[in-house]
C-alpha cells in the first residue's frame, strides 16, 4: 500500500473511531451507572434478592433463547469474528448482555462488567463497519470497538487500547489498529466521564526501593503468586464451563438448579460479601479495612461458578478484587506495604488471567500513578511468564 493510500485509510479509521467512541462511551455510561445503582440497592436488600437468583437465571436464559440464541456465545462470538471464523454479531447482543448482567448483579451473582463493555463496543463497531461498507479489514473495526468498550467503562484508555490489540491473538500485537483504537478509547473515556461515570483511582502512599536482596526476592514471589492465581482462575473457569455443559446439558436446568446452592452460599458466607463486582473488597483493601485471608479464594470460586452455570457478566473487576485482597495478605506476610502489594495484585492478576502484558502495566499507570512503574513492570512480566498462555478467553488464538 502506498503511503498516501495508507494515510487516507488511517484517517477513515480514526474518524470511525471517534464516532464509535462517542456512541460506546454513552452506552457504557448508561450501563455502568445503572450497574452501580443496582449494586448499591442489592447491598442493602440482599436478603430479599438473593433467594430469587435461580429465577433470575431462568429469565436471562429465556431472553437469549427467545431473542438471539447466537448471542449466548458472548466473547466467543467476538473472537470468532476477529479471527475471521464468523462474520456476524447480532445487534441484539447489546441489550441482552446489558439486561442479563444487570439481573445477575441485582440478584447477587458474582461477576464483572468489562466483558460486557467489550462485547458492546465490538458489536457496535462491527455493525457500523458492515453498514457503511467499511474498507478491507473488519478486524481493525472490532479492535476499535473493544478498546472503546473497555476505555469507556474503566476510563483507562491506554490499558484499553493495549488490551484490545493484545487479546485477539496471543503474543501478537495488532499495531495496525493502534492509533484508531487509542482514539476510540480516549473518546469513549471522555464521553462516559462527561455523562457522570466516575473513574476509580488510588494514590499509593508507601513504596519500596529495590535495593535489598530480601526485597527483590519478595517482589519476585509476588509476581509468581499473582501469575499462578490468574492462571488458576482461567484454568478453573474453562474446565468448570466444560464440566457444567457436559453434565447438565439443558441450560435452563443448569442455571436454575445450580443457582440454588450458589445463592445459599453467597447468603450464608459473610452476607453477600462475595456478590457482585467485588468493588467492596477493592475499597476495603485500599482503605485499610478488614481483608480476610480467604477473600481472594472465595471471590475466585464464586465468580467462576456464577459464570460457568450461565449468568452474564465479565471477569475483570472480580480479578481486580482477587488481586487486591491477595496482595494485602501477601504484603503482610512478606513485610511489604499492603496497599502497594494490593495495587500490584490488582494489575498482575488481571494480566495473567487475560494473558496480556502491556495492558496490566498500563492499568498500574492509569489507576495508581507512575511512581511505582518499575515494580508494575517487574511483577506483571513475571506474572505473564508464569501464566503459560492460559486465558479467560479460551478462544484467544495462539
Which positions does each model-derived feature cover?
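Alpha-helical transmembrane segments and immediately membrane-proximal extracytoplasmic
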Residues: 1-398
Amino acid at each position: 500500500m502506498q503511503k498516501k493510500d495508507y494515510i487516507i485509510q488511517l484517517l477513515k479509521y480514526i474518524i470511525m473511531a471517534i464516532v464509535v467512541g462517542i456512541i460506546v462511551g454513552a452506552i457504557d455510561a448508561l450501563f455502568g451507572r445503572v450497574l452501580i445503582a443496582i449494586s448499591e440497592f442489592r447491598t442493602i436488600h440482599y436478603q430479599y434478592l438473593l433467594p430469587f437468583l435461580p429465577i433470575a437465571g431462568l429469565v436471562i436464559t429465556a431472553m437469549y433463547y427467545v431473542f438471539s440464541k447466537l448471542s449466548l456465545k458472548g466473547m466467543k462470538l467476538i473472537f470468532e469474528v476477529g479471527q475471521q471464523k464468523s462474520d456476524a454479531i447480532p445487534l441484539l447482543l447489546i441489550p441482552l448482555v446489558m439486561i442479563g448482567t444487570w439481573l445477575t448483579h441485582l440478584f447477587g451473582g458474582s461477576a464483572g462488567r468489562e466483558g460486557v463493555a467489550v462485547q458492546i463496543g465490538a458489536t457496535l463497531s462491527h455493525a457500523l463497519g458492515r453498514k457503511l461498507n467499511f474498507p478491507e479489514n473488519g478486524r481493525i473495526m472490532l479492535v476499535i470497538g473493544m478498546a472503546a468498550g473497555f476505555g469507556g467503562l474503566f476510563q483507562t484508555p491506554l490499558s484499553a487500547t493495549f488490551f484490545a490489540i493484545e487479546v485477539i491473538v496471543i503474543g501478537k500485537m495488532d499495531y495496525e489498529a493502534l492509533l484508531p483504537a487509542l482514539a476510540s478509547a480516549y473518546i469513549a473515556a471522555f464521553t462516559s466521564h462527561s455523562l457522570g461515570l466516575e473513574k476509580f483511582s488510588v494514590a499509593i502512599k508507601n513504596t519500596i526501593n529495590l535495593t535489598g536482596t530480601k526485597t527483590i526476592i519478595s517482589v519476585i514471589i509476588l509476581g509468581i503468586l499473582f501469575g499462578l492465581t490468574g492462571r488458576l482462575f482461567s484454568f478453573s473457569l474453562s474446565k468448570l464451563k466444560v464440566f457444567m455443559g457436559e453434565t447438565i446439558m439443558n441450560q435452563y436446568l443448569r442455571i436454575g438448579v445450580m443457582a440454588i446452592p450458589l445463592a445459599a452460599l453467597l447468603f450464608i458466607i459473610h452476607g453477600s460479601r462475595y456478590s457482585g463486582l467485588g468493588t467492596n473488597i477493592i475499597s476495603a483493601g485500599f482503605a485499610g479495612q478488614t481483608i480476610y485471608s480467604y477473600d481472594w479464594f472465595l471471590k475466585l470460586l464464586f465468580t467462576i461458578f456464577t459464570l460457568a452455570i450461565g449468568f452474564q457478566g465479565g471477569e475483570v473487576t472480580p480479578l481486580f478484587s482477587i488481586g487486591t485482597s491477595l496482595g494485602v495478605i501477601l504484603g503482610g506476610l512478606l513485610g511489604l506495604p499492603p496497599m502497594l502489594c494490593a495495587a500490584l495484585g490488582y494489575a498482575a492478576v488481571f494480566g495473567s488471567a487475560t494473558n496480556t502484558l502491556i495492558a496490566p502495566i498500563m492499568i498500574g499507570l492509569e489507576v495508581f500513578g507512575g511512581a511505582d512503574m518499575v515494580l508494575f513492570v517487574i511483577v506483571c512480566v513475571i506474572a505473564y511468564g508464569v501464566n503459560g498462555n492460559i486465558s479467560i478467553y479460551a478462544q484467544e488464538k495462539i
